[in-house]
Amino acid sequence: MDKKSARIRRATRARRKLKELGATRLVVHRTPRHIYAQVIAPNGSEVLVAASTVEKAITEQLKYTGNKDAAAAVGKAVAERALEKGIKVVSFDRSGFQYHGRVQALADAAREAGLQF
C-alpha cells in the first residue's frame, strides 16, 4: 500500500463516521503548492462555502501559497464565509492528512475566527 492509498483509506473511514453523525463538515485538501477548504452539507451533495489559495483575493495577501501562513489565511476566510451563512458548528474532516503543519494552522485559524469544532 502506497502513501496515497493509505491516506485515502483513512479519509474514507473518517467520512463514514462523519456521515453517521449527520454533521456539516469542514473538508481540507492539501497539495504541495495550495490548500483548499470547503464546508459541505450533511447530505454531502452541496458545497455551502469554499476558500483556497487559488483565489486571487487570498493570494494577493500572501508571499507563497504552500505554507502555514497561507493555510491560516484560508482557514480565516472559510470561517468568515461560513459564519455569514449562519454555519457555526462543523465537524473537521482532515481528509486523511496528519493534523500537523498546514492542516493544523488552517484549523486553528478557523477556530479563532469563530467556527466551532
From Swiss-Prot:
The keyword Transmembrane helix does not apply. Keywords: Ribonucleoprotein, Ribosomal protein, RNA-binding, rRNA-binding. GO terms for cellular component: cytosolic large ribosomal subunit. The keyword NADP does not apply. It comes from the Bacteria. GO terms for biological process: translation. InterPro entries: Ribosomal_uL18_bac-type, Ribosomal_uL18_bac/euk. GO terms for molecular function: 5S rRNA binding; structural constituent of ribosome. Pfam families: Ribosomal_L18p. This is one of the proteins that bind and probably mediate the attachment of the 5S RNA into the large ribosomal subunit, where it forms part of the central protuberance. Belongs to the universal ribosomal protein uL18 family. PANTHER family: 39S RIBOSOMAL PROTEIN L18, MITOCHONDRIAL, LARGE RIBOSOMAL SUBUNIT PROTEIN UL18M. Part of the 50S ribosomal subunit; part of the 5S rRNA/L5/L18/L25 subcomplex. Contacts the 5S and 23S rRNAs. This is Large ribosomal subunit protein uL18. The lineage of its organism: Bacteria, Pseudomonadati, Pseudomonadota, Gammaproteobacteria, Enterobacterales.
